[in-house]
Design a protein with these regions (language model features):
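N-terminal capping/linker segments that flank leucine-rich repeat
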Residues: 1-34, 39, 228-276
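Intrinsically disordered, low-complexity segments enriched in polar/charged small residues
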Residues: 18, 73, 85, 93, ...
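Canonical leucine-rich repeat
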Residues: 32-35, 52-55, 72-75, 92-95, ...
Length: 276
């Protein structure tokens, strides 16, 4: 290991570890020495690392984002959080059963290993994924946008955030009653499933939708630019009529693009009318 200024700083930080945490983010280093056996938290993101040494069995947190890594070593069974975005990773190792958070977006991944039953947060956007394993029942946050996915598995009843933008999806599975955020623009969707009453944010722009299901009373934002929509609600009211009486409900603004006799929604936002 060359002993440049940042390497000296690295060795100094390793020798000074007191709470099990090693933060070497942004250091200009290409390799690491043997790591302390008591290490619990390792942040080596935004470095020039191309390989990691054996990871301590005590490790619970690993951040290696924005590095030159293309392979990860065996992950310790104690690991709870793994952040490996923006690297050249094409395969993930076996994931420990303790894992709660996995961030592996902006990588070369084409498949995911079996997901642990403890997983709560999953970011796998901007990858080559075309199929998903079974989703754990504990999952609350899923971002699988800008992938090759054409179908989603059954969604867990705990899910609150689903982002599946710019995919090959033409249909969505049943949405859980806990969902508050649905982001599905740039897809092949022509119909949406029943929307949960908890939904506060919906983006279905750049889809083939021609009608929306009943909108929840909790909805705060609705983006439906460049769709085939002519009706906002199931009572048959046209967009043009609806926009004339926006203050009767909670509509902040409705942007209308007219094409002859047709109206196309550009953006539709909701807010609490009491704010005026």
């Amino acid at each position: 290991m060359a002993h440049g200024p940042d390497t000296v700083e690295l060795l100094s930080r390793i020798s000074a570890i007191r709470d099990g945490t090693l933060d070497i983010c942004l250091l200009n280093i290409t390799s690491l020495p043997k790591l302390p056996e008591t290490l619990t938290h390792l942040d080596c993101g935004n470095t020039q690392l191309s390989v990691l040494p054996k990871l301590p069995e005590t490790l619970t947190y690993l951040d290696c984002e924005n590095t030159q890594l293309s392979v990860l070593p065996k992950l310790p069974e104690t690991l709870r959080e793994l952040y490996c975005e923006n690297i050249q990773l094409s395969v993930l190792p076996k994931l420990p059963e303790t894992l709660i958070c996995l961030s592996c977006g902006n990588t070369q991944l084409s498949v995911l290993p079996n997901l642990p039953e403890t997983l709560t947060y999953l970011w796998c956007h901007n990858t080559h994924l075309s199929v998903f394993p079974k989703l754990p029942e504990t999952l609350t946050y899923l971002d699988c946008g800008n992938t090759q996915l054409s179908v989603l598995p059954e969604l867990p009843e705990t899910l609150t955030h689903l982002s599946c933008w710019n995919t090959q999806l033409s249909v969505l599975p049943k949405l859980p009653e806990t969902l508050t955020w649905l982001n599905c623009p740039n897809t092949q969707l022509s119909v949406l499933p029943k929307l949960p009453k908890t939904l506060t944010w919906l983006n279905c722009s750049y889809t083939q939708l021609s009608v929306l299901p009943k909108l929840s009373e909790t909805l705060t934002y609705l983006y439906c630019e460049n769709t085939q929509l002519k009706i906002l609600r199931n009572d048959g009211e046209s967009i043009a009529d609806y926009s004339k009486r926006w203050d009767d409900w909670r509509a902040e603004q409705v942007y209308i693009k007219r094409c002859g006799e047709k109206c196309q929604v550009i953006r539709y936002e909701l807010f609490d009318a009491a704010d005026f």
